[in-house]
């Protein structure tokens, strides 16, 4: 089984020029809408140009592209293959990013919109969970990016 997992959507109705999707994530207890209005990187590189990542201690992400294209860079040293690049579009389903996975994303030139149907655990604190971590100041232990 791959370390990279998706929560697929279900098409439950189609009419001319309209598709109805069930995008339910049973595990979700929070939803975030993340809009990149152009070719954005989140989190952006730091002041010296080093990559930065988010690493949530108390949240699993279920990131689903609803418009555009977004590419995720993932590092998780507990996986058999700790480094992955995953390109998402509206057909991909929700990319599951487990807690403690280093991650960042890059949008295509036209930007992108992602809904994150997250699962937040006891101890979640938004002011702590969304602080970028710089590779210049923090080692990823196994690999250098």
What is the predicted role of each segment?
Residues 109-129:
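A short hydrophobic beta-strand segment most commonly corresponding to one strand
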Residues 56-76:
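Short, conserved beta-strand element in jelly-roll/cupin
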Residues 78-97:
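Short acidic-glycine-tyrosine-enriched beta hairpin
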Residues 38-45, 91-94, 98-100:
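Tight coil/turn sites that cap or link beta-strands
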Residues 72-73, 97, 103-109, 116:
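Short beta-strand His + acidic residue motifs that chelate non-heme Fe in jelly-roll/DSBH
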Residues 1-46, 50-53:
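A short, N-terminal "cap"/entry segment at the start of jelly-roll beta-barrel domains
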Residues 134-138:
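Low-complexity intrinsically disordered segments
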């Amino acid at each position: 089984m791959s370390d990279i997992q998706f929560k697929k959507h279900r098409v439950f109705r189609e009419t001319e020029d309209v598709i109805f999707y069930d995008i339910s994530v049973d595990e979700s207890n929070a939803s975030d809408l993340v809009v990149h209005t152009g070719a954005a990187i989140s989190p952006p590189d730091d002041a010296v140009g080093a990559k930065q990542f988010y690493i949530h201690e108390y949240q699993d992400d279920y990131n689903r592209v609803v418009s555009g294209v977004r590419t995720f860079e993932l590092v998780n040293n507990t996986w058999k293959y700790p480094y992955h690049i995953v390109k998402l579009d509206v057909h991909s389903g929700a990319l599951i990013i487990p807690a403690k996975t280093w991650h960042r994303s890059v949008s295509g030139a036209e930007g992108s919109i992602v809904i994150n149907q997250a699962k937040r655990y006891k101890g979640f604190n938004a002011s702590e969970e969304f602080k970028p971590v710089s590779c210049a100041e923090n080692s990823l232990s196994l690999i250098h990016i």
